[in-house]
UniProtKB/Swiss-Prot annotation:
This is Lens fiber membrane intrinsic protein. GO terms for cellular component: plasma membrane. It is a multi-pass membrane protein. It comes from the Eukaryota. The keyword Signal does not apply. The chain crosses the membrane at residues 4-24, 67-87, 99-119, 141-161. It comes from Bos taurus (Bovine). Residues 1-3, 88-98, 162-173 are cytoplasmic. Eye lens specific. Glycans are attached at residues 43, 61. The record marks 62, 134 as: Not glycosylated. It is found in: Membrane. GO terms for biological process: lens development in camera-type eye.
């Protein structure tokens, strides 16, 4: 059980760090604008070496930002629950700590999937036509890696929960 929780905690730490970095950085998309290199993130866009805040309130940016922040918060609370799961005495007999941590990591995975799906859909259908020479960049890719890490953290914690439940049910009362 503890090896699964340890693996889950490792994946969770890596996934949460990647979520925060992906959300905060400005390299979701790279393109050429009037022959100059440009890139944009969720909060700023940069032309050459000069960066500007994205002041427009565009729905897909707001949705992507909100879901990335929700994903980071779920992953952080999952880490806290995952650390507490190492404690021996459960405070609630009906609520398993590894199960709760696993659910939080799956919620984080769901939110980052929503954020990346929205961003991908709008970028490919609208911005891809606007900018001829463009590509997704490393911040966007970190978001997908974070999705995998939070998903595997949830899997590890669910495996730890199942092992604990099987042991609990097999011991005589």
């Amino acid at each position: 059980m503890y090896s699964f929780m340890g693996g889950g905690l490792f994946c969770a730490w890596v996934g949460t760090i990647l979520l925060v970095v992906a959300t905060a950085t400005d390299h979701w998309m790279q393109y050429r604008l009037s022959g100059a290199f440009a890139h944009q993130g969720l909060w700023r866009y940069c032309l050459g070496t000069k960066c500007y805040l994205q002041t427009e309130s565009i729905a897909y940016w707001n949705a992507t930002r909100a879901f990335m922040i929700l994903s980071s918060l779920c992953a952080t609370s999952g880490i806290i629950m995952g650390i507490v799961a190492f404690a021996q005495q459960p405070t609630f007999t009906r609520l398993s700590r590894p199960f709760s941590a696993g659910i939080m990591f799956f919620a984080s995975t769901f939110f980052v999937l929503l954020a990346l799906a929205i961003y991908t859909g709008v970028t490919v259908s609208f911005l891809g036509r606007r900018f001829g020479d463009w590509r997704f960049s490393w911040s966007y890719i970190l978001g997908w890696v974070a999705l995998l890490m939070t998903f595997f953290a949830g899997i590890f914690y669910m495996c730890a929960y199942r092992m604990h439940e099987c042991r609990r049910l097999s011991t005589p009362r």
